[in-house]
Regions:
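N-terminal Rossmann NAD(P)H-binding glycine-rich loop of SDR-like oxidoreductase domains
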Residues: 15-35
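NAD(P)H-binding glycine-rich loop region in Rossmannoid oxidoreductase-like domains
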Residues: 58-104, 108, 134
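Conserved Rossmann-fold NAD(P)-dependent oxidoreductase catalytic core, especially the SDR/UDP-sugar
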Residues: 107-154
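Flexible, glycine-rich beta-alpha linker
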Residues: 132, 175-192
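Catalytic helix-loop patch of NAD(P)-dependent Rossmann-fold dehydrogenases
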Residues: 136-181, 202-206
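Mid/C-terminal beta-alpha module of Rossmann-like enzyme folds, strongest
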Residues: 227-292, 310, 326, 330-331
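Amphipathic terminal alpha-helices
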Residues: 308-316, 320-342
């Protein structure tokens, strides 16, 4: 064991990945282990470890909701070389939970690291393109860092506030990634689209042109480790696969890979989508569940321009996305089938 730890230390140092049981987090853990990092999966006591079975993974339980407990948990381990913060929520029963869990708890985490003298070499924060909201909706220009954020979702606002907090901390070694829609094996929101296609129904929203972007989960992981390798700090990067797609491209690829002979295509006007979204959210709240279709999802589907400028990531990190949508959907559907999801 001592030799193994020394090997890991020499290979890359120690890395803590919060939200490790989640979609992006579990792939980051796998890649960290593969690269020889001393890999720590930050999880809740109740988190599933289904995708964290490698015996080389160490676990650290973190209670972000209790700052005093969190400080004891962090002190018990000591400083990590790198922290990749994936923990957070993408849908909630109460929209106020976005503020509490994505913003305030992340700020408490950062404050604890600073107060305990546990600041890592890099603190990598997984944010979202949604922090900018609907920008260049008429011109369809790529969203870039010089644009003014105007998020119209509770999720986007919570992530933006955390970005702004990081940027105010003098000398804090943050790196921010703002991926567009991330898809791949283990992801459940895009999986709902596959389920709909399996039922021979494809639903789109709005009648005006919509430019969509996507990024396969492995390319997000690639970007994170490129940032670690380059040692960059106090930078923010957009991530996509570099391509722009129409609103039908994803569903067309699903139809092809799933071998569906026919599909009914429905295009809802935005006002109808809004009504359906609010009703779905209301019904889910009555059942004390978080609905995938909600007012945040309505604003996401309403947005027409999802182009973003990945140039800085390409130039500064050497980011080179390896998966376009064609390849990514093929691998994703294959995984769904192999794992009994389809």
């Amino acid at each position: 064991m001592k030799n193994e730890k020394m090997k890991n230390k020499e290979s890359g140092g120690s890395v803590l990945i919060t939200g490790a049981s989640g979609f992006i987090g579990s792939f980051l853990v796998e890649e960290a282990v593969r690269r020889g990092f001393d890999t720590w999966a930050g999880v809740r006591a109740t988190s599933s470890r289904a995708y964290l079975q490698d015996p080389r993974i160490h676990f650290l339980e973190l209670d972000f909701g209790k700052p005093d407990v969190l400080r004891r948990q962090l002190t018990g381990h000591g400083r990590f070389d790198y922290i990749v913060h994936c923990a957070g929520v993408i849908k909630c029963i109460d929209p106020a939970d976005f503020e509490r869990m994505n913003h305030r708890q992340t700020c408490d985490f950062i404050d604890a690291l600073r107060e305990l003298d546990l600041v890592p070499r890099q603190f990598i924060f997984i944010s979202t393109l949604s922090v900018f909201g609907p920008v260049h909706e008429r011109t369809y220009e790529p969203i870039c860092d010089s644009d003014t954020p105007c998020p119209d979702t509770a999720y986007g606002r919570s992530k933006l506030k955390t970005e702004q907090y990081l940027q105010r901390l003098e000398g804090f070694p943050y790196v921010i990634f703002r991926p567009t829609g991330v898809y791949g094996p283990r992801e459940r929101d895009y999986y709902l689209m596959a389920q709909s296609i399996r039922r021979h129904v494809d639903v789109a929203a709005g009648f005006r042109r919509q430019d969509l972007t996507s990024v396969y989960v492995a390319d997000v992981v690639q970007a994170v480790f490129l940032a670690i390798g380059k040692g960059v700090a106090r930078r923010a990067y957009f991530l996509s696969d570099g391509q722009v797609y129409s609103s039908r491209t994803f569903s067309d690829l699903l139809i092809r890979e799933m071998g569906n002979p026919w599909v009914i295509r429905l295009k809802l006007p935005l006002f109808a989508l809004k009504i359906v979204s609010l009703c779905a959210e209301w019904w889910a709240k009555r059942r004390k569940k978080a609905s995938t279709l909600n007012r945040d999802k309505y604003h996401i589907m309403k947005q027409r321009n999802w182009r973003c400028d990945t140039g800085p990531a390409v130039r500064e990190l050497g980011y080179a996305p390896a998966y376009d949508l064609d390849r990514g959907v093929r691998l994703t559907v294959a995984w769904y089938k192999e794992n009994g999801w389809l």
